[in-house]
Amino acid sequence: MPDRKRVETFVAAVVSGDHVGAIRDFYCEDASMQENATEPRRGRDVLMAHEAKALARLKRMHTHPARAVLVDGDNVVINWVFDATDQSGVTRRLDELAIQRWRGDRIAEERFFYDTATAWRVVEPG
């Protein structure tokens, strides 16, 4: 079970933009990550490679400070907002909930929930 300080350190790493480093430093070796109802990706190395590839396609990824962070035993819920600017300069926003199950001080499972009708809508950079 993570303590709140450990979760806040994870959130700060993501907000700083070090998404791949956050996976390296805060996820279990056998962690899984799942988008809405798609099949989960499994294994920390797979998760880091997927994140690095996604970020490499972008000009910029801005992570807003978490809107809410709830910690209840091994369960953590974070409301993230991401602004992704593509190579042509168009910025799109994702507002999602990440539901995590921690094992000790690392994330074992994470699933993202968002409204597919509004996900990645075009916004002014912010």
List each model region and its residues.
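Hydrophobic alpha-helical core bundles mediating ligand binding, dimerization, or RNAP-core interactions
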Residues: 7, 11-14, 27, 51-55, ...
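Hydrophobic/aromatic beta-strand elements that line small-molecule binding cavities or substrate pockets
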Residues: 51, 64-70, 81-82, 95-101
